[in-house]
Amino acid sequence: MTIINWTDYFLEVAKTAAMRSNCLRSQVGAVIVSSDKMIKATGYNGTPSKVTSCYERNSCYRIENNIQSGTKYETCRSIHAEQNAIIQAGMDKCKDATMYIWGHNFICILCKRFIVQSGIKDIYLKKDENSDLVHGSADDLRDQLEND
């Protein structure tokens, strides 16, 4: 029997959360984990509650208008997985926690702000099964925000 390590375990949870996404363009999942390895919240990218999703509409404004990934976030009707998880957890459960993200290997400027403000300490990202694991810290994100 093989027991997977904590990082792989939490990335699998994030991967499962991504399967709830109702975004036609990308499926991203996030999980917030306390320092004692307890899951505090999960999130996935999708429309806010009671808003018709692009999946239900079978239409995505960003796809139809060839909007490049990483730009013009205000044109998207969805909430990012990271933001959704932070909202679900609340700041008290985010302090000194770790966030695991499945579905991309970068963090947009909007989510950098959320993560830094929430008190999350470390972040692990994995785009897909074949990509390398990316690790960063809130301090790294803070530095990026300072220098952008």
What are these regions (language model features)?
Residues 1-148:
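Zinc-dependent deaminase catalytic domain
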